[in-house]
Every structure is written in C-alpha cells, then in structure tokens.
Amino acid sequence: MKFVDEVEIRVEAGDGGAGIVSFRREKYIPEGGPDGGDGGDGGSVYLQADENLNTLIDYQFERFHRADRGTNGRSRNCTGKKSDDLIIMVPVGTRIMDVDTQEGLGDLTQHGQKILVAKGGFHGLGNARFKSSTNRAPRQKTLGTEGEVRNLKLELLLLADVGLLGLPNAGKSTFIRSVSAAKPKVADYPFTTLIPNLGVVRPEANKSFVIADIPGLIEGASDGAGLGIQFLKHLERCRILLHIIDVMPVDGSNPVDNAFAIVNELHQYSPKLAEKPRWLVFNKIDLLPADEAKALCEKIAQELGETENIYSISAINKSNTQPLIHDVMTLLESMPKEKFVETTDEEVEFKWDTYHQKAAKKSDDDDDWDEWNEDDYDVEVVYER
C-alpha cells in the first residue's frame, strides 16, 4: 500500500433541526395552546486514532466528510432526533491543523483517542418555548444554527523512540534490518529508501523500542535537493537520534563534511529537533583493518568535536551492534515518554461557540416577546368549541 503522510480534507458538521409552530387540537380541549417541538442537534465530526491504520491514503480520494442534519421538531411537543456524530478513523500519530486559521487542533498519539474537530449546530426552538402569560398563542420559532465547517490538514508523524539520520547509502536500512525484523529494501544506489520504515528492536525478552528509518538527506535538502527534508517530521517524536556515518563513502567524499551537512540540514529544519540527543554511529568499519578503522573513527570524531556516545559498527555483519542497542535501551529507560509528549492546555475555540454566544446575546438584547401582539402581524386567532 502506498504511504501517504499528509492530506487535506473538508469536514462539515450537521445543521441543527428547526423548531415548528403548532397548536394542540383535540376534541373537548378548546384553546389547547402551543405544542410545537424543538428540532434536533446536528451531528458533530470527530477524528479517532486507530492502531490498525498506517497511512492516510484513503483521504486522498475521499476529501469531503459531512455529518447529518438534525431533524425538525413536530407537533405534540415532539423533539426532533439528534443526528449521529460522524467519526473519521485515522492512524495513531496524526496531527490535525485548521488550514484557514493555521490553528493546531491536537495530536492523536494513543489508540482510541478522539478529538472534536467540527461541532454540530444547535437545535431550533418550537413555539411552545415562547408561551407566556401575555403571549398564549406564540407564532415564533427559531431555526437551528449551522454546523461548523473546517478545512483540515492531517499530518501523520511516526511514533518511534529512535530515529536514524544519514546520507543516502550510509547503511541506515542495513542497520535496521540487522537489529530488528524489519526488511526495508537495500541496494547499492542512492535513495533506495523512499518512505519511512519502522522496526521493533528487542534487546531483551521484556524490553523493546521502536526505531524509524527515513530516506537519506543530502546537502541542500532544505532547498529541495534530493527528496527534501519533508521526512524529518517523522523524527520529531523520537527521543534519540542515531547519526549513521559512512567511513568509506563510495564517491570518495569526506565523512566529516558529510556529517556537518546532515547537522546543518537538521538545524535548518528545526532547532528543537537538532537539540535532541544525537549519537554518532560509524558504519562499514569492516571495509578497513581494525587498527585503521579505529584511528579513522577517532579522527572523524575529533574533527566533529564529539567525545561521547560514539560507536563503530558494521551493520551488514552485525558487528558491535548489540552494545549500541543495549546502551540505547538503557538511555530510553531513563527518559520517560511523558517528558517528550507535547501537551497544551489551550482550549480550542470552535466557530459554533462564538456564533451561538453572539446569537444568545442578541436574543437577550432584543427580548420583546412579552410585547408581541397578534394584531401587529394581521393574524386573527379563532378558537372553536
């Protein structure tokens, strides 16, 4: 299935049903009075996270989603039926943003988590609501308010503990194959990896973490070179970054320059992402004698100004990968996930709330129902026995 991590959709909540004007008409009950019922509330639209989904491809072709309208009221004080809410299922890790206001509505980071994105319209009132001691035959009613309409941008951000960084052909996919059951494509040409891949690493029987492999970056990626930096967003929720460095690039380039290019692209994309713990992992040391490989790695680390969290491995034959995995697991256990979950106490203001508050205020300011007179509307009410 094609991996799609960004789509735009339009959601429309249902309008509220209208109230009606009706009067009770029964034998032996003269002047029965008003009995017009209220309408029903319109359906709201929710987004809910589902762990069984892993792509947003369905919403590339199904962009419009509308909840049903509430039904109108009926006579005998019968209230209209409230419409059912519309629930749209999305993958866990989906971020929701209003396209028009650029307002962040929330992140769905847990299975079953649900967020209201468009509130249904409020029901209209029937004429029974307007009866009073001075207005016994009211002919007023209100229509239901309109449901909220939003244009939403959905972004899928992978939920991983560890993210892999590096140039194309640095050995990221080979590394994730060697430490997990994931089987991303591996070949001897650049940009073999075109979409992010996830793998579950189990250092011990009851311990595990998720590692994410994204397409390689190149110098100028922030300006659109290569596949760009669009996939870096999948590392935003990672707690540790592993910077895979090829000590023997096939093009003869300098590993130090290559490493600085990746760090520069990281800073241009997000200074916050660049501040995450980043470990250097020198790969392909099997291409050199042990002494030469050790000396080269130390030289590169010195030029990069790194003195801690440096590892030398050979992903293809799994050499020195286990110590790295155990150290990663140890660090993750000391870094609770809750520390990295972005939370906000800011309440989302829905357009329906603003509309209804204004309508209620206007109704209070212009409240002249008690002064209503049938003669003002040239209506004659005749009651027959």
From Swiss-Prot:
GO cellular component: cytoplasm
Residues noted as binding Mg(2+) in the record, renumbered to the chain: 173, 193
Gene3D superfamilies: GTP1/OBG domain, P-loop containing nucleotide triphosphate hydrolases
UniProt keywords, alphabetically: Cytoplasm, GTP-binding, Hydrolase, Magnesium, Metal-binding, Nucleotide-binding
Cofactor: Mg(2+)
Intracellular or extracellular location(s): Cytoplasm
InterPro entries: G_OBG, GTP-bd, GTP-bd_Obg/CgtA, GTP1-OBG_CS, GTP1_OBG_dom, GTP1_OBG_dom_sf, OBG_GTPase, P-loop_NTPase
Family stated for the protein in its record: Belongs to the TRAFAC class OBG-HflX-like GTPase superfamily. OBG GTPase family.
Residue ranges constituting the OBG-type G domain according to the UniProt record: 160-333
Quaternary structure and interacting proteins, as annotated: Monomer.
Name used for this protein in its record: GTPase Obg
The protein's role, per its UniProt record: An essential GTPase which binds GTP, GDP and possibly (p)ppGpp with moderate affinity, with high nucleotide exchange rates and a fairly low GTP hydrolysis rate. Plays a role in control of the cell cycle, stress response, ribosome biogenesis and in those bacteria that undergo differentiation, in morphogenesis control.
